[in-house]
Amino acid sequence: MVGEEETKKRVVTESLGWLTESSIMPKKHRAIEGVGPSSIMELKAQLYKSQEEAKQTKDFTGSDAQYHRAKERIAAKDSFAAKNSGVESRNLKDKLEHKAVKDGAVSYAALEKKAQLYDKLARGELSDEEGEEKYCVDFFRKGIQHEDPKPSSTYNSSISAPPEDFKQDGEDDGSLFSTKFAGLGHAIGTADVGQHVRMVREVHEEVNQAREKATELKQRRQEQATNRREKLKQAYLRKQLEKLKAQQQQQEDEQKT
């Protein structure tokens, strides 16, 4: 009887979960490489720990669980950490621009660009097309369309009357100059639009003359450069011709000797 009990115990310990009612005989225990009794105990301990945690989460229900979740949600939210995209890059760009303006780099670059433009105008290297691209304002048209001159301009009381060319039929001197006496020897008047247009035309003509002079100077320099290149080319061809003649003469002398 004692031997049968020991045999039953041994079969139960070696079955490792197989059904005892099965007709299949239990296999012998196989040793797994790298797995020992200590590692099996660690796995069982980890399994027991996970089961206990699952039980605690199931038991932890009601208002306490809701309070715990709400508390974690509030702690995780940080309103100051959220930023729009591109804020840091814009701040850095603004700081660099402010520093450049404060140091005077922007003003220096503008003055340097203006000086280069003036040098080109003085040398006549600025073409008409480039000038039109640089200056996008038509000053002549702007002066003609200007119909609201500034009302306050002080003149001397001994101002002369406007010429007869600017008068129309039925107009007198007072229609072209609106004069108001402000005191002894002083008067406040407004110049007519025709005089303003005439001044703008004079400035426009001066600008055109200066532009024509610059164009002529540029053409003259281009012609001089072309003539210089042509002279150099002729001199180079002459030298090459002299070299060829010298080589032919040398070959003829060698053949004779």
UniProtKB/Swiss-Prot annotation:
Q: Where is the composition biased (Polar residues)?
A: 151-160
Highest rank taxon of the organism = Eukaryota
**What Gene Ontology cellular-component terms does the record carry?**
nucleus
Positions of modified residues (Phosphoserine) = S127
| Keywords from the named record | Coiled coil, Phosphoprotein
Q: Which InterPro entries match?
A: CCDC174-like
Question: Any coiled-coil ranges, and where?
Answer: 196-257
Region of interest called Disordered, as start-end residue ranges on this chain:
146-174, 210-231
Q: Which Cys pairs are S-S linked?
A: none
* Cell wall biogenesis/degradation as UniProt keyword: no
Identify this protein by name.
Answer: Uncharacterized protein At4g18257
